Amino acid sequence: MAKRSTTRRRPGRKPAFRRPAVQAAVAGLRYIESSALLAALLEHDASVLAALQADGRYVTSSLTFAEAARAIIRARVAGRLAVAMEQGAVRGLRTFERRCFIVDVTSAVLARAGRPFPVEPVRTLDAVHLATAELLAEPPQLVTIVTRDARVRDNARALGYSVE
């Protein structure tokens, strides 16, 4: 997969997308939700690792990186992760960050997250991920949601997305 160039924010500008416009992606868009990324980083989940190596453009919410970083720290503090494994997980997280489009949590994302979803109840952070996927300006048929979370999976399917 070709390396994507990164673009930096200009002072005073707050674009919804921090990398090249996601709207330009026509097919093969894969929204990576935090539970799936953590399954790859901490559990080496084979199906998620395969999904992360599949063809397509990867996109995630900026929320994913905060969630993943906190989960890695919690795992180390709880004694479930050795220091070397923590370092490997952090490296993997940074590698993923360089490979994907990152969508900021905007007021539009938060407004959508605050409205009902087809399958309730939905936790707030899950609603933010679902709202982010919905606001990508792509038809659901062109987006695959990669997740390990049952609530996200059920809602993604109800919204017309394919799920891995």
Question: Where are the language model's segments positioned?
Answer:
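Short, well-structured N-terminal submotif of metal-dependent ribonuclease cores
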Residues: 2-67, 75-88
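Active-site neighborhoods of divalent-metal-dependent phosphate/nucleic-acid chemistry enzymes
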Residues: 17, 99-151
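Generic structural signal for beta-strand residues in well-ordered domains
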Residues: 23-24, 51, 95, 115, ...
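Short hydrophobic/aromatic-enriched beta-strand-loop microsegments
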Residues: 32, 162-164
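Short, function-defining helix-loop hinge/capping sites that tune catalysis or transport
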Residues: 41-43, 134, 157
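Anionic, Ser/Thr-rich low-complexity intrinsically disordered regions
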Residues: 50, 58-60, 73-77, 83-103, ...
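Short, amphipathic alpha-helical segments that act as regulatory/interfacial helices
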Residues: 69-73, 134
